[in-house]
Curated annotation (Swiss-Prot):
Residues 173-316 are annotated as: VTT domain. Residues 65-77, 131-250, 295-305, 385-406 are extracellular. Keywords: Acetylation, Autophagy, Cell adhesion, Cell membrane, Endoplasmic reticulum, Lipid transport, Membrane, Transmembrane, Transmembrane helix, Transport, Vacuole. The lineage of its organism: Eukaryota, Metazoa, Chordata, Craniata, Vertebrata. Residues 1-21 have a biased composition (Basic and acidic residues). Its main location: endoplasmic reticulum. GO terms for cellular component: autophagosome membrane; endomembrane system; endoplasmic reticulum; endoplasmic reticulum membrane; endoplasmic reticulum-Golgi intermediate compartment membrane; membrane; nucleolus; phagophore assembly site. It is found in: Endoplasmic reticulum-Golgi intermediate compartment membrane; Cell membrane; Vacuole membrane; Endoplasmic reticulum membrane. It comes from Homo sapiens (Human). This is Vacuole membrane protein 1.
Amino acid sequence: MAENGKNCDQRRVAMNKEHHNGNFTDPSSVNEKKRREREERQNIVLWRQPLITLQYFSLEILVILKEWTSKLWHRQSIVVSFLLLLAVLIATYYVEGVHQQYVQRIEKQFLLYAYWIGLGILSSVGLGTGLHTFLLYLGPHIASVTLAAYECNSVNFPEPPYPDQIICPDEEGTEGTISLWSIISKVRIEACMWGIGTAIGELPPYFMARAARLSGAEPDDEEYQEFEEMLEHAESAQDFASRAKLAVQKLVQKVGFFGILACASIPNPLFDLAGITCGHFLVPFWTFFGATLIGKAIIKMHIQKIFVIITFSKHIVEQMVAFIGAVPGIGPSLQKPFQEYLEAQRQKLHHKSEMGTPQGENWLSWMFEKLVVVMVCYFILSIINSMAQSYAKRIQQRLNSEEKTK
């Protein structure tokens, strides 16, 4: 692996020398031009240039569709096999018979797994910004299960409506029968699938860096370019962010599997750098993905689950509400909506929602719903901006290639 990396470095250095010698290009002017182009792309956002952003976004979609159509056309055998398999599955799904009970069971599990894996992928990939699906979906789900478990003294919620809606079973348990482990077991599938999704979402930086290293070509990805610049100026790094990135890079490079496992197991915003580092230094795929999967889907998820469950356990919640009420002056007015919300949730769990305050009238529920809407809208806007900037980068690359051929 070290020899491969050394050969790739030598090949890239040779290509850079040839490029500079052949075209008499000053490296400083090249870097300045790249900086200007990056600033131009960053200005292409909906709130600054809405018409151009929407135009470039639409054109980028057309380019991507054209590329995928071409790829599928050159893989006709795979496409035909997939369509035949899809036809068999559709026929099995709609044809009546004794197999329908198994089909419905498989469909339910498949949709559940796909939902949480998809949210995990969205949380990692983000296309420019992460949709924090743990804070918006998985965390609230674990909190709801925790509150319901302590209220019902059971985790055997009726299915259906669980997991879409949580209500207490007809035969509730006795006080004190709920343990931390029982709640962890109840939400294990959702949390594990979400963790698998986040691990899958970390693959693009790895594959991008690996392909750039093996080809010896100049990478197009800005994060990878920043990574190479960081390696070049490693000794002169002074600020905390640069030192933290270098620490992650050295940990992954020197420790290998267990270094990747450590980075994946601890919630941190620098794990993308671990994927780029592994790809750049040609770490084997299963070493990277195996460590990432174990770290994110098992270790990290259990840390996050335990934190949420403890935070929303019955006595902690009661203490937090009491603490809010003790705030001088505004305490009682702040405490009231929390008490109303918790009371409404208890009544819903016991099929008595019509007797309590409707959830829609509670400002806590209203604020959380609006927060979800705002974050999802921001995520969609970031995708539009990111794709528009990708098309702008295509234009810049085409113009640069035309200048070189003149």
